[in-house]
Each structure stands twice: as structure tokens, then as C-alpha cells.
């Protein structure tokens, strides 16, 4: 029986995948275009042809990664029939699921936030519509008494920082030679949910 031919991803996709992995685990400044080219199986000139320079590559990586993160968070926010804490929990679970399947992606989000300046502004611009939705949701839930009344944007910032930090901690441990087990990830998520529930409800 003939075997199926391996799927060959488009060059641009391969370069973006490699860049997400390297920027998200090693850091942007510590990664060269030569390393990205080697990891994606192309020449450096090919990377430059598609993205112009390293900053252009970072911009494309941010756009794609932010869109992927937004889709994952949207799934949690848009689940029907959920209100109050149940919807917050759904968003946290969606984030941890993304971290399990695409750990370098959340590492990249953290790296872009660390870089600040134009890269962080670009990430914020892509996520801003989702931030508005989440803030409006918190306003409604606080008015209904299902979530403790606080400044919704500060709550969102604290929750975002806590969840992204906890989710990317998995990749940090893996890089240090302590690969997480499914049980340890579930335990970390459970602890985080308990912490957030005490802070919000």
C-alpha cells in the first residue's frame, strides 16, 4: 500500500513557525536570522526576501501569534450559557490548552511584552478588540454581583499577567530540563483557578 507523501508547508509558514519557536524560547535578541533560516530549512536570503529584515519578521510573527491567541481566548469568551466565574474559568482553560499545544506561542507573547515599544504596541493593537469585550463582560458581571466590584481593566491586566505567566512557566521548566507531566500542568491550572476565584468572587 503506497504511503502518503509528506506535507510540505509553504516557505513563509515554515519560517514563521521557526521564528515563533526560537523567539518564544530563546528570546528575540538572542536569535539570529541565520538560526531562523537553519531551523526552517531555507537560506537566510529567503527569509529576507519574505520579511525584509529581522524587525519585519518579528512583526509578521506578532500578527499571526496574536491572532491565534485571540481565537483561543474568543472561544472561552463566546461559549454560550456561561456567566460570571464560569466564563472566566473557560478563558483560563482555553489559555492552558493553547499553552499545551503551542507552548512557544505564549512564550513569544511574554517576550514581546518584555521588549516593549513598537512590538508590544503591535501586539496590543491586535488584542485590543478582545480587551474591550472582556472589559465589557467584567462590567456586566460586576454590576450583577457575580464578580467583586473593582476596576475592570486592572482586573483584566492582573488576570492576563497571572495566566500568561503560569502558562509559560511550563515551557521555562521544560527548557531547564524539567519536562512537566500532564498531572503537574493540571495541578498548576487548578491552583491558578483557585487563586483567581478568591480574587474575583
Explain the meaning of each model-derived region.
Residues 1-2, 97, 101, 131-144, ...:
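C-terminal peripheral helix-coil segments that are non-catalytic and often amphipathic
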Residues 14, 18, 22-56, 60:
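Helix-turn-helix
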Residues 86-89, 121-126, 142-160:
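All-alpha amphipathic helical-bundle segments outside canonical DNA-binding/catalytic cores
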Residues 60, 74-104, 152-159, 186-189:
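Hydrophobic alpha-helical connector segments
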Amino acid at each position: 500500500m503506497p504511503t502518503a507523501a509528506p506535507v510540505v508547508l509553504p516557505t513563509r509558514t515554515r519560517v514563521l513557525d521557526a521564528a515563533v519557536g526560537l523567539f518564544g524560547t530563546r528570546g528575540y535578541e538572542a536569535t539570529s536570522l541565520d538560526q531562523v533560516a537553519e531551523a526552517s530549512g531555507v537560506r537566510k536570503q529567503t527569509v529576507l526576501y519574505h520579511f525584509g529584515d529581522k524587525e519585519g519578521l518579528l512583526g509578521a510573527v506578532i500578527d499571526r501569534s496574536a491572532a491565534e491567541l485571540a481565537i483561543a481566548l474568543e472561544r472561552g469568551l463566546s461559549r454560550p450559557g456561561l456567566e460570571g466565574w464560569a466564563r472566566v474559568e473557560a478563558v483560563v482553560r482555553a489559555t492552558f490548552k493553547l499553552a499545551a499545544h503551542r507552548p512557544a506561542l505564549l512564550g513569544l507573547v511574554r517576550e514581546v511584552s518584555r521588549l516593549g515599544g513598537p512590538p508590544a504596541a503591535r501586539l496590543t493593537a491586535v488584542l485590543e478588540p478582545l480587551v474591550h469585550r472582556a472589559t465589557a463582560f467584567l462590567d456586566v458581571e460586576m454590576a450583577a454581583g457575580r464578580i467583586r466590584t473593582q476596576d475592570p481593566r486592572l482586573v483584566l491586566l492582573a488576570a492576563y499577567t497571572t495566566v500568561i505567566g503560569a502558562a509559560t512557566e511550563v515551557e521555562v521548566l521544560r527548557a531547564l530540563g524539567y519536562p512537566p507531566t500532564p498531572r503537574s500542568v493540571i495541578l498548576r491550572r487548578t491552583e491558578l483557578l483557585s487563586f483567581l476565584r478568591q480574587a474575583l468572587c
